[in-house]
Amino acid sequence: LLCNKPLINYTIEEALKSKYLDKIILSTDDKKIAQITNKFGITVPFMRPKKLAKDNSPMLPVIKHLLNKLEKDYSYDPEIIILLQPTSPLRTVKHINEAIKKFLKSKSDSLVSVTKLPHNMNPYSIMKLERNGNLKKFLKYDEKKNLRQLKPIFYARNGAAIYITTKKTIFKKNSFFGDTILPYFMSKIDSIDIDDQLDWIFAETIIKNLKNLWKIK
């Protein structure tokens, strides 16, 4: 439990607040998680196949399987797909709505939430370990110049907390991304993606502090 609440609840509660989501569907192989979501009225039309529920299973085949089965067995054929992964507990309905509105106003065929990379993770700071044991700069640059000032800003997917794409893009490109990818910028704090125990501790600390701030207000 993250601050006495199942991790998935954070995503469900915020998704339910959005006026833009016509239907919320959960893909899982865990009956306990399915029971939790049923209490919220979230649809779990079928359990995810075991072959698509391994720790290293990529998300794209899961979504393609879900869409194919929804169309074949339930005659449900959505045009726009919004993927909200449960490992982003600080992603709120505000983020969801803003991302959807940005996507709908654009001519892009995909959107992904991103956060700015810190100085030490910028590609110009990264070094590659060669087979001979030596380090090599990942990108070349003029060391006579102030690198901090010259570095271009790079962004990375934050989990990603939000993916928006079309069914057409998923099956035509075999990817969540089409030819035009729109960014939705999120802060470092809101971008926390729980992948290990340290991420969990960070998220728990931030949530507890936010609660204290709300109490003060």
Report the location of each language-model feature.
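Short, surface-exposed amphipathic charged segments that create phosphate/polyanion-binding patches used
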Residues: 59-64, 125-128, 197-201
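Conserved alpha/beta core of the MobA/IspD/sugar-nucleotide pyrophosphorylase nucleotidyltransferase superfamily
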Residues: 154-217
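N-terminal glycine-rich phosphate-binding loop and ensuing alpha1 helix
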Residues: 1-27
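Conserved core of the sugar-phosphate nucleotidyltransferase
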Residues: 61, 80, 89-180
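Active-site-adjacent beta-strand anchor residues
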Residues: 26-27, 113, 163, 193
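A structural signal for isolated positions on well-ordered beta-strands in alpha/beta enzyme cores
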Residues: 23-25, 111, 182
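Short phosphate-binding loop-to-helix
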Residues: 16, 25, 31-82, 91-98
